Amino acid sequence: MSFEISREQYASLYGPTTGDAIRLADTELFAVVEEDLTTPGEEAVFGGGKVIRDGMGQNSQLVRDVGVPDLVITNVVVIDWTGIYKADIAVRDAHIVAIGKAGNPHTMDGVDIVIGVATDVISGEGKILTAGGIDTHVHFISPDQIETALSSGLTTMIGGGTGPSESSKATTITPGEWNIHTMLRSFEHWPMNFGLLGKGHGSSISPMAEQIRAGAIGLKVHEDWGATPSSINTALQVADEYDVQVAIHTDTLNESGFVEDTRAAIDGRVIHTFHTEGAGGGHAPDIIELAQYPNILPASTNPTLPYTTNTVEEHVDMLMVAHHLNADLPEDVAFADSRIRQETIAAEDVLQDMGIFSMTSSDSQAMGRVGEVLIRTWQVADSMKRQRGPLPEDEGTAGDNHRIKRYVSKYTINPAIAHGIADSVGSVEVGKFADLVLWEPQFFGVKPDLVIKGGQMVYGVVGDPNGSIPTPQPRWYRRSFGAYGQAVHTSAITFMSEASIRAGLPRALGLQKTIRAVHGIRDLTKADMRHNGETPRLEVDPETYEVRVDGEPVTCEPQDVLPMAQRYFLF
């Protein structure tokens, strides 16, 4: 016998279902549930008098060894590059093992995830689940960045640095074997996934190759060390030999060549371009043109995202500090001014919205904010919907699903693909490491409810530890048990080169964290960037800096009010 209830009542009990729309934070973006993998009338719900009890929704006979999951997240709406859908998510041995309908097949229909005695439950009713975010442009200057990143929904940090040295503040590089080994040992303490970039500067292969053998997952070419054609070519030769990525911050001053010369040095090989608009650094004024080519994997850093009335004004002073410039030297001031172009910044949001720019990242403490990768990505999406309307694929629908999938891909699956770690992280798919972030819809993209690493809860909003229940004020982010002791070894991954792992380096360094190799990078093209693989013709007018896509000018207006801002933060 069936029992009918209203959609509103159903959503209040079990969360939204197919056809329901969810507003994301205070934006104008609405996610519509495309599919519900649970069974109506057979929902698995935990609590007093609820379903998941002995002999009801829980099977009390099966032992863990037959495949009973360690954790089930019930009735949650997933927002991922793969789709926007409702499901139960099963985690076992730190990995996602099933997506579908959880419960007890002895008493319920349609069960493909068996909840057993060994199973913990997180209630996802009315909440949103995403993959953990990936920041590929991290200057490792302060360890406090890691807590800030976790509390924003990031679970993987890729970049370089050794602490607050001048070169680390500027160049996202961990140079040389000794520094790389020191940083790899430091990462043992943190419930965060890490990968290091070595110094991609040298006229011979050996000094760069030894950094890959020392555990770096790629090389960084940066103008502050000299982004010369020779360095670019040599770094890419090493990358091709070891199957790693090269990230590049090109030559703003055009001292060693123009954008055409950099493109010639790259010579069709895949490369990850940082802050491809140029305010963060790169050939002035036309670095943005590189994003049209299929071997270029272009990203933005978040200080220019979204374009606001304050963006240009804050950038000059920020740049002077980040790149060790002297405000009393006219040459240094001119260098800074050349990078800050209102016209290309105004085009950047549109290029992100069109799927021409594929990724977002932070440039943490070096002209970017590590805790705002997600916020600023979604602020761009909101600004573009307000200014450009629905994307063509979303026309005539009740929501913004195509745009939402495009933007969530920018900080999840696409950076994972770019750095050869997509078989481990970057999406909510069976077989992936269970790096998951749970959100209340009204706080989506701003403040996570719970951060899960490798199936373990590592960070979440919890109340007074002396409270009689978990919710009394003050409620703030606190570490959970997966962030302590030896649990960190299984809740987080250190990514290293295949060559270093084959040589036994993790054991030699005494590393205890889960180790994974990067791979499958050198054959990538922009077509591999999910929902963000467009390659139209791009041009920048050398005098006016106007940006054109297939001959048409692109720009947007600066925003003076943003969502996901003052409503959520005091400062």
Swiss-Prot record:
Reactions this protein catalyses: urea + 2 H2O + H(+) = hydrogencarbonate + 2 NH4(+)
Location of N6-carboxylysine modifications: K220
Any one cellular-component term (Gene Ontology): cytoplasm
GO BP term (any one): urea catabolic process
Cofactor info, note text: Binds 2 nickel ions per subunit.
Cofactor(s) essential for the protein: Ni cation
Binding residue positions for Ni(2+) 1: H137, H139, K220, D363
Cross-referenced SUPFAM superfamilies: Composite domain of metallo-dependent hydrolases (SSF51338), Metallo-dependent hydrolases (SSF51556)
E.C. no: 3.5.1.5
Residue positions binding Ni(2+) 2: K220, H249, H275
CDD domains: Urease_alpha
Gene3D superfamilies hit by this protein: Metal-dependent hydrolases, Urease, subunit C, domain 1
Urease domain: residues covered: 132-571
Recorded superkingdom: Bacteria
PTM comment: Carboxylation allows a single lysine to coordinate two nickel ions.
Keywords: Cytoplasm, Hydrolase, Metal-binding, Nickel
Name of the protein in its database record: Urease subunit alpha
